[in-house]
Amino acid sequence: MSGSMAQAFAHNFLGHSPRWYKACIVGFLMLNALVLWSVGPVAAGWLLVIEFIFTLAMALKCYPLMPGGLLLIEALLLKMTTPQALYEELQHNFPVILLLMFMVAGIYFMKDLLLFLFSRLLLGVRSKALLALMFCFLSAFLSAFLDALTVTAVIISAAVGFYSVYHRVASGNDPRQDSEFSDDQHLPQLHHEDLEQFRAFLRSLLMHGAVGTALGGVCTLVGEPQNLLIGHEMGWHFAEFFLKVAPVSLPVLVAGLVTCLLLEKLRWFGYGTLLPDNVRAVLANYAAEDNAERTPRQRAALLVQGCAALILIAGLAFHIAEVGLIGLMVIVLITAFTGITDEHRLGSAFKDAMPFTALLVVFFAVVAVIHDQQLFAPLIQWVLALPADQQPGMLFIANGLLSAISDNVFVATIYITEVKQAFLSGHMSREHFETLAIAINTGTNLPSVATPNGQAAFLFLLTSAIAPLVRLSYGRMVWMALPYTVVMGLLGWYAVSYWL
C-alpha cells in the first residue's frame, strides 16, 4: 500500500478526532483481545466497560457511536456476548427505543409553543436563583408523571431555540431564517464575552433541569422505567408505590431543591452565572416581534400544539399506550392540524434523536456483556451475605456505584431479581423484602446522577445538539453534578438505613 493511501486511511479513521484519540481506540481494540486470551473474560469485560466510559467522556472529541460501535463489534467477534443476547436486551428495552424515535420527534413539533412558554419564563423571572429553582422543580414535577427523557427533550429544545436566536442576531443574520449557529467565526469580537456568559447560564439551567428529572423520577411508579419494573415485582400500584418510597424520595427532593438554591447563591461548581443584559435584550426583542407579527395561522398552530401537549400529558399519566406510541400520536396530530405535509420537514424532527438511538443500542450491547460475564454477581452475593440490618444501606451504595457506570434499569433488574429469589426461598420476611426493594429503587435513581452513564436523560443531554454549543462536556457534567450527587447520595443512604 502506498504511503499516501495509508495516510488517507489514517486520516479518514474517526475523521477529525485528535491523533492521540485515534491511537487510544486502536490500542483498546488490540488490548481487549490480549486481555481476554491472557487473563480471561471477566477482566476483559471490565476493561470494555472502562473503555466505553472513556468514549462517553470524550464525546466532544468524537461522537461515541463510532468508537463505541467498534468496541461492540470486537466484543461480539470475541464472543464476550452474542448477537442473540444483544437482540434480547434490545427487545427488553424496546419501549425506550420507541420513545427516542417518536417522542423526541413529537417534542420537536412543539418547539414553537415551548419557546413561547420558556421565553416568558426566562424573561419574566429576573432572579437567577428563582429561575433555576423553577426549572429544577418543574422538571421534577413533570418527571414524576412523564418520562425523564421527554422532559429533558423539552428543556433541550427550548435551550437550542434561545441559543440559535441570540447567535444568529449577534452574527448579523435573521433569527427566523435557518442559518448555521454552531460556528463562532462570523461572530464579532464584541459579542464573544456575552456568548460565553450565555453558554454558562444555559449550562446551569440544563443541569438543574436534568437533576430535577432524577429528583422527581424516583417518586412515582411511572417516573423511571426501573420504578415500573420494581413496582410490578412488588405488586405496588401508583399510590402505594409513592407512599412506600416517600420516606426517602420526599426528603431528598427537598434537599435537592435547597441545593439548587445554594449553588446559585454561592456560585459554586459552575453555577450562578447571570443572563447578560445584551442577550436578554435580544431575546426580549425577538419575543416582542414574534408576538406582534404572529399571524392567525401561527396562533392556530400554537393552539394545536397546546392541545397536543395536554393530550400528551394525559396519555402518559394514564399510560394509555407505550410512551413512544403516544409520541407518534402527537406527531400525527400536530403535523395534520398545522399543515406540515412535506417529507423533508418531517425528516428534520428525527435528526437529533436517531444518533442517540443508535448509541443506545451500543450501550445495551455493553450491558449484554456485563450480563453474560456476570460482572456484578460477586457484589450482589456479598451484599446479600451481610446482616439484615446492614443490607438496605449497602444495597443502596452498591446500586449507586454500579448505576453510575452502567444502565440503572439493568442494575435494578439484576438486583430485584436476585432479592426476590432470596425472598421466595424463605431467606427474608415480606417487610424486609419491601425495604430492600425501596433501597434498590432509590439506589438506582439517586446516586446515578454522578455520571451521564447512569441516567439516560443525562446521556441524552451529553450527546444532544445543545451540549457542544454550550460547551457541556462529560467532565463538566460530572463536576456540575457532584454537589447533587453528594447531597442526594448521602441523604438517600441515611434515609434508607434509618428511616425505613
From Swiss-Prot:
InterPro entries: Na+/H+_antiporter_NhaB. This is Na(+)/H(+) antiporter NhaB. GO terms for molecular function: sodium:proton antiporter activity. One of its GO terms (cellular component) is plasma membrane. Its main location: membrane. Na(+)/H(+) antiporter that extrudes sodium in exchange for external protons. The chain crosses the membrane at residues 28-50, 58-78, 96-116, 129-149, 150-170, 205-225, 241-261, 311-331, 350-370, 394-414, 449-469, 477-497. Keywords: Antiport, Cell inner membrane, Cell membrane, Ion transport, Membrane, Sodium, Sodium transport, Transmembrane, Transmembrane helix, Transport. It is found in: Cell inner membrane. It is a multi-pass membrane protein. The gene is nhaB. It comes from Pseudomonas fluorescens (strain Pf0-1). Pfam families: NhaB.
